[in-house]
Amino acid sequence: MNNVLSTNIAGKEMKVEFGKIGMLSNAATFMSYGDTVILTNVNASSEPRVGIDFFPLSVEYEERLYAVGKIPGGFIKREGRPSEKAILNGRAVDRTLRPLFPKGYRNDVQVVCTVVSVEKDNLPEILAINAASMALCLSSIPFTIPVAAVQVGLIDNNFIVNPNATEREESTLHLTVCATKERVMMIEAGGNEIPEDIMIDAIKFGFDECQKIINFQEEAVSKFGKEKDVPTLFTVDEEVEKDIKEFASDMIKEAMYITDKDERNAAIDAVNQKVKEEFGEKYEDKFGDIKEVLYNMQKKVVRHMLLKDKRRPDGRAFDEVRPLGCEIGLLPRTHGTGLFTRGLTQVMTVATLGAVGDIQILDGIDEAQSKRYMHHYNFPGYSVGEVKPLRGPGRREIGHGALAERALEPLIPSEEEFPYTIRLVSEVLSSNGSTSQASVCGSTLALLDAGVPLKRPAAGIAMGLITSEDLSEEQVLTDIQGIEDFFGDMDFKVAGTTEGITSIQVDTKLKGFSFNVVENAIRDARKARMTILDKINECISSPREDVSLYAPKTETIQIDPDKIRSVIGAGGKVINKIIQDTGVKIDIKEDGSVFVSSSDHAGVKEAIKIIEGLTKDVKAGEIYLGKVTKITTFGAFVEILPNKEGLVHISKLDKERVNKVEDVVSVGDEILVKVTEIDSQGRINLSRKDVLLDQENKENKEEK
């Protein structure tokens, strides 16, 4: 049976089909918004997974190139590993859904969102969140709180819900708001220095728009939703809980109140060891219960410390930033380096400048795009004092790299202002909370050190939240450290400049958070950001006047677009010879902009001279210094500009009669010649005789 339901969202039809496809999945839906369609399949294991202390949720965001009528490139001609954008979209779906499952639910759950049709005006990543929530709500899986997502744009101080492709180009804000009926669940934002008040209003606007989609989901569930399963939730053995609390409660409290991180961790390890020695044999098959009890005890102490004692684990005020350190120019051969330290969090960011042609080409379900600014983030095990295998970047590294990239993107100078490709790499050297925002600060330092003329310096800060169990009390924290992140309820990352916000990323462990939290976090984040920017300005207040000695030197010239073929030559013969002879990189745009890059400045000058010669028009009446390239019985061929030759007829070689060309010139000689004619076929006629006569006349006049 095919169940169909539709509604109107922002002037476009949103439709869900349920029951027709994926009959063996717990729930499968086709959800469309305009011509963008997501196939969503959700399934769960029948029994909880034993021996784990987390919820095993897997969210897969699958892009199919047939969705945009493309055939994958390469030899295999099929989709490979997910693109970076697909990974980020999958993370957004996961972060929105995960807190809404029942506490203690340990069944394996898989959500697969497959993009099967894409209309560029309607983003599939926004629809995927709505489709995933819809499928879970319709399934028998114990997911009962609908969540919705919208994108908010800003054009001429007016908010736009789910802007189309043209509006997204014009918009200064790209905000994704995910919300339930009562609370905000997740926020992602990139903006062109958006003032705090406008950002808060935009989030409220997005929340209100989400309600229409939530009502749509509730209507669908009431009409054809499945009966929900009664889950088996993980609960701690009461006897284990009682014994551990009686034995370790005082020791846990004493350990958690130690201010120094290393000493506190050592004290906690000692308590854990004592508990193991005391109850290891009695509860040898209850290790998971013991671990859960110890975690809950520590969490309770931290919450009491913050909410009742009004103090933080390291003794800071709630709105206080940890001690800051900024340094530039650490590495002698790199193009720019920034070392940013905040408490025990430390990130070194290295900037590399490349030629314009070093851009990254992105080709997926979106239209082909290029990136001339990119940021990569590495988080090795040694940053937290652990032994871990070094592999390629995971989803977390990709997500953090993209977040820091987004924070600085609106501040990067245009290609016309700064003709370089820019790559940043942030190496996390030490991690105790908020390494992604430390990467923003390190990136600012590295870019300024590299001589990149940023619009303004940027900085980032992570805000946190601690609430009571009944949510009656809540406390926003500035610059959360590891322990506050681990036991806290929210990670609210904000980056920006003195003028406004450039990026936000918010996720929570709760079933949402209030607008009061949103407002306080955004306003407190600004105060902290100003403190950090002051410190950055003390270190370096403006970009270096020149790029590094080891960075490529890039110069730009403009040529007639019709002359581009003259520079490239047949099969690239001409441009490849220039590159080979001068050692430069050459990039040519369709509008005639030519970018010449090399670490050898002389090579750049020589290449430009050649290109200008290739594109310069030969004019009748002008005199050129040319090189004899070929001799015939009737005259000599002379190259007056690169790839431009003319003929000096034997009668035009000298003032006197010439019987043999070789009597006057040889191959390789440089001679002055005048262009006497360019015929209808473009052939150039030259005269050495006219030059000699002109010189003779000039000398005669001077003698008189």
From Swiss-Prot:
It is found in: Cytoplasm. Residues 621-689 form the S1 motif domain. PROSITE patterns: KH_TYPE_1, S1. The keyword Magnesium applies. Keywords: Cytoplasm, Magnesium, Metal-binding, Nucleotidyltransferase, RNA-binding, Transferase. Its main location: cytoplasm. It holds the Pfam family RNase_PH_C. Mg(2+) binds at D485, D491. Residues 552-611 form the KH domain. Its EC number is 2.7.7.8. It catalyses: RNA(n+1) + phosphate = RNA(n) + a ribonucleoside 5'-diphosphate. Its cofactor is Mg(2+). One of its GO terms (biological process) is mRNA catabolic process. GO terms for cellular component: cytosol. One of its GO terms (molecular function) is polyribonucleotide nucleotidyltransferase activity. PANTHER family: POLYRIBONUCLEOTIDE NUCLEOTIDYLTRANSFERASE (PTHR11252), POLYRIBONUCLEOTIDE NUCLEOTIDYLTRANSFERASE 1, MITOCHONDRIAL (PTHR11252:SF0). Belongs to the polyribonucleotide nucleotidyltransferase family. Involved in mRNA degradation. Catalyzes the phosphorolysis of single-stranded polyribonucleotides processively in the 3'- to 5'-direction. This is Polyribonucleotide nucleotidyltransferase.
